[in-house]
Regions:
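C-terminal output helix
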Residues: 105-119
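Charged docking surfaces used in two-component/phosphorelay signaling
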Residues: 17-25
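Active-site residues of response regulator receiver
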Residues: 55, 82
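Receiver (REC) domain active-site loop signature in two-component systems and cognate sites
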Residues: 58
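Short, Lys/Arg-enriched segments at the junction into DNA-binding effector domains
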Residues: 4-5, 117-130
Length: 130
């Protein structure tokens, strides 16, 4: 099986490492970006990214702007992983096209399960379209 690529975007390197460690153990290949601009550079240059995990509060370009840019080009699944727990923020995420919204602190095992579930759904949908 080819490794499924996940792009993890967070300005906190500890958070990126935590998520990367858990996803790598499950066989995913994790690419990292420290802000939205870096994330877009990576995303636009790698057409094999299957899922993006995105923080909201980051320097240079926040998660909302990053998501808007990604949605101009792709319907890749996106999970927001953020400390912004307000209902208004969560609704904004769904309005912008987020597939999941997970607030910090979070359970890494639940995150891995949600990643797998989203990828299963998108894989099933792609199979049905053929």
């Amino acid at each position: 099986m080819d490794s499924i690529k996940v792009l993890m975007v967070d300005d906190e390197s500890r958070m990126r490492k935590l998520v990367k460690d858990f996803l790598t153990r499950e066989g995913y290949m994790v690419l990292e970006a420290g802000d939205g601009e870096q994330a877009l550079d990576i995303f636009m240059n790698d057409k094999n990214i299957s899922l993006v995990i995105l923080d909201v509060m980051m320097p240079k370009m926040d998660g909302w702007e990053t998501l808007k840019e990604i949605r101009k080009f792709s319907q890749v699944p996106v999970i927001m992983l953020t400390a912004k727990a307000d209902e208004r923020d969560e609704l904004q995420g769904f309005d912008l096209g987020v597939d999941e919204y997970i607030t910090k602190p979070f359970s890494p095992k639940i995150l891995v399960a949600r990643v797998a579930a989203i990828l299963r759904r998108t894989s099933d949908a792609a199979s049905e379209e053929k």
